[in-house]
Structure formats: structure tokens, C-alpha cells
Amino acid sequence: ITGDYGEVAELAVSNNLSDVKLSPDKPLNSMLALLAKDADETFEALGKPVQFEYKIDGFRLQVLKSKTIKLYTRRLENVTKQFPEVVEYLNKYVSAHDFILDAEAVAFDLKTGRHKPFQTISQRIKRKYNIEEMAKKFPVELNIFDIMYYNGKSLTDKTLKERRKILESIVKQQKKKIVLTEKIVTDNKKEAEKFFKKSIKEGYEGIMAKNLESTYRPGRYVNGWMKIKRILDPLDVVIIKAEYGEGKRAGWLTSYTIACKSKNSLLELGKVSTGVKEKTSGLT
């Protein structure tokens, strides 16, 4: 419910953990999805029908509105200043007094309108200066897919079906500015596979599969959400950065930034962290 571990510790010491409540003034840990190999696996795990959505190759953003609008990354870093146009879209096209939204910001090509890879938008996240110039060079579209708080009430215990209905009632969609993720609801394998192929053709990562009755579980990998991604050909990459882990993995390098060769330079691809087994982690 809260990403503020200091607050949790203080409340635990005073035996007041029940006082932790969702608030549009503080970000929470985002809900996460398990990996599935195909539609059959999602139907088996989630039941039927399933809501399938495009999986956006963008940057996860949590949007909070109380007195003002604030934008946070999945790691709860405040990046509001880096996306002034997104704040403008939210103020203009979302009708609510206060809210917490789950979304993906994705860069797009001004000429073709097609989405650009994650690396493009990462340049904006890192930028502290010349923000307006970067906004013109790398415009973004906000794709909203969930709502956890609305007009003074937590929605985390509401079903996905109910939450999506609220989103559809308060967001005035504007292409290349602010939209809801495209979705279908089906119990048909062929329809799901067709939707997956369509997502790949249009340049997306794959699709998300969600149980219509699932509640929002902050910071957890649960069976309520699953993802089906395109299987890529093997790549030759190099590690250009490593970060130390926390807790049980403190003192070990557990997160690796990888890159591939692009002409005479290295192009950052992203981070790799999952899949490191305890037996081999001592080699890092």
C-alpha cells in the first residue's frame, strides 16, 4: 500500500500498522505480472474469459493527483519535471478530483506515429535540463491501464472489470497524448492468438492477460496478471554496469545493465536481474 519503508517501520514500532492507508499523496509499489508461454497457460491460470491488453514497451509511470499531479517510476522516483506535457494531458483530459493511475509512457515517431523502443524515453527520464527541447524531440503518449484510487476512495479491492469501467468514464482519450490500453475480453484461444500477432505487427512487446475479477495487489507477482512476450532471437551483449542487491542479496551484484554494439558505440538495451540462481550468484 505504501512505498515509504520509514513510515512502515515507525508504525510497526508503535503497533499502528492498521493506520497505513492508500493516499494520492504517496506512491505505492506497482502490481507485477507473471510470465506465461501462451494463451492456453493464461486461461488455465486465470480462468475464462480473460482481458488481454497490448503490452507497451515504454516506461512504467504511476500518476498521483491530490493538490497537484506527480509522476513516479516503478522504483518510486519522482519524474514529474521530466514530463510537463503528460501533466498537462492529465489535467485536461482526466475528470476526477484525485486519483492514482497505473500507466506506461511510450515515445513515438513524429513522422510515422509508431512507438519507439524504451531506450528513447529513457533519455528523457535521465535529463535534468533542456526538458522542453527533449519533449519536442521525443514526444510521449501516456497509456493508462489501471486505477487504484478515485475521488477519496481506494479501489484496490475492486475488481479489474470495475476499475476499467471507472477509467473509461473519466478519461477523455486523445491519440498520441493520453489513451487507455487497447484490450479485448475473450475465452477463445484463436482470438487471443490473433490479438497477440496484431500486437507484434504494430510494434508492441506482446500482450498482458488479466483476470476480470482480480483485485490490485501492490508490489506482488500474482496470478491475477500474466504476460505473453515475443520470443526474440539470441543476442550477443556486454555488461556495462552492475548494481548491488538489497536484503538477502546485499553485497552481491544482482542487477546488470546490458548493451549491444551499434556501429562504433554501445547501445543500452536494458537491465537483467531475474534468473540468477543462488548456486551461481556467488560467481558475480
Residue ranges and their predicted role:
Residues 274-284:
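Generic long, charged, amphipathic alpha-helical segments
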Residues 64-66, 218-221, 249-254:
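Short glycine/proline-enriched turns and hinge-like loops at secondary-structure junctions
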Residues 2-6, 78-79, 84-89, 196, ...:
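Electropositive nucleic-acid-contacting surfaces
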Residues 1-185, 254-272:
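N-terminal nucleic-acid-engaging modules of covalent nucleotidyltransferase systems
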Residues 31-52, 56, 189-194, 211-247:
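Flexible, glycine/threonine-enriched loop-and-boundary segments that flank and lead into catalytic domains
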Residues 204, 244-250, 274:
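Alpha-helical scaffold/interaction cores of sigma-54-like transcription cofactors
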Residues 126, 204-205, 231-236:
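Acidic, His- and aromatic-enriched active-site or binding-groove loops in soluble protein domains
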Residues 3-7, 171-218:
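Metal-assisted phosphate- and nucleotidyl-transfer catalytic regions
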